[in-house]
Amino acid sequence: LTPFLKQASLYISKNFNIRFDPEISSKDLSTRIFLATSGYQAYVMQLIHQSCLNTMNNNRLVVSMSDFHAAYASKNILYKPMTQKNIFQLNPSQITEILI
């Protein structure tokens, strides 16, 4: 998933001048994206797309964790989550517990 996320980030940065903080391919965010989508690329792209739209609608150029939370919580995107918890609001230790 990480190489896919790196390419998506490069494409979005180059074509839309939008970046991610934390970086989308970081261990933390990529793990959350995987847990939210089970790694299905179509679902990953829907999540990224909606997160970027949230950012642009708020006149910002940096996609934050809160944008992913809003996109995930909107429930208008198809997912196959690995947990029923909102993965983008959990702290890192809670993420680790889900992975165990």
Where are the language model's segments positioned?
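C-terminal alpha-helical "lid" subdomain
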Residues: 2-100
